């Protein structure tokens, strides 16, 4: 039921009215109840923060990191040695695969809080449930013991919703709003770790620095039952306009024992941290040795690579020199082949010319032989003709002598003539000339081969 200005109940229009009020003002409180207690300073302070609180209730997609300015607000160098020197977590870039879009919107792209490493620290560790026999030979995995069923969420109070924190703060300030008290009454912290429940069971004003890791507030001074009784007493005293605060303190020895338990836990944690630090130092030293060995191998390999590159360059240069020589030899070989072909052609031409010359020489030799044989024949014919001429001359001389003898004249009485001698007497030359001219004319007519020459 929602009260209006005249105090009448709305009845069936409760859902519509509540929806309208939530849509307009972002709050489940009606305007009459909101502005009824303006004379109270605490109420005025609370309602003046509604707009701010409403802006904090925006969806996760529109949220950004809301934190006060600190040393991380200034730019931090990106040198990895800076984070290693101060034992800081390096910022996770926005292109990290494990960096979800929800973490980017909530914590920002350059925040370490949304990194996978820090998220693993803030999330509770899962606990394997204890298997119990249900009496039917089967094991029931749903154990009723919260130590086995609930995770040990150390930072559960840090991740409590903003509305729950406002309810805590309102109840401690003594605001007489029934809705807030009814909401705070249903708060259940039984599922937490017992030690954490003792530490954070008291309803206190949420302080940002008190919830950071490493900050330990005072132990709880009231149990859950006392808190419930206190809430009931506050609810009972709302009608009278005052809030009666009740508190029950624990025994000092119990508080001291709790402090000692916490200190012993811190000692164990410090020992574990020391062992972990030694392991990390050993691992870092081993990594440095490995890094040094890798650097040495790298420089050795680098020097070897430089030598190989120099040798490769030398081989490359020698290869190109050899290739140029090969090209020259190839050109010379092609030139020699051309010259060989030219020589072969010339030899063939010479051979052909030699054959033709031999044929010509043979023909000339044949002609020479023919001419020689012809000369010999002519020589023989000349000898025959000479013999014939000599015989004719001898016969003519004999005939002349016979005629002279018959005529009684002896012209050759004082002169002896030989056909091998060409000497004649001048006195007888005219007579012989006339005589021989007549005789030779008759003789030429008798020679048969003269006309055939």
Curated annotation (Swiss-Prot):
Residues 253-407 form a coiled coil. It is found in: Cytoplasm, Cytoskeleton, Microtubule organizing center, Spindle pole body. Keywords: Coiled coil, Cytoplasm, Cytoskeleton. Component of the spindle pole body (SPB) required for insertion of the nascent SPB into the nuclear envelope and for the proper execution of spindle pole body (SPB) duplication. Connects the central plaque of the SPB with the half-bridge. Required for proper localization of CDC5 at the SPB and for proper M-phase progression. GO terms for cellular component: cytoplasm; spindle pole body. Residues 61-73 have a biased composition (Low complexity). Residues 34-76, 93-116, 135-161 are annotated as: Disordered. Pfam families: BBP1_C, BBP1_N. Homodimer. Its main location: cytoplasm. Belongs to the BBP1 family. This is Spindle pole component BBP1. InterPro entries: Bbp1_C, Bbp1_N. It comes from the Eukaryota. The keyword Protein transport does not apply. Residues 40-55 have a biased composition (Polar residues).
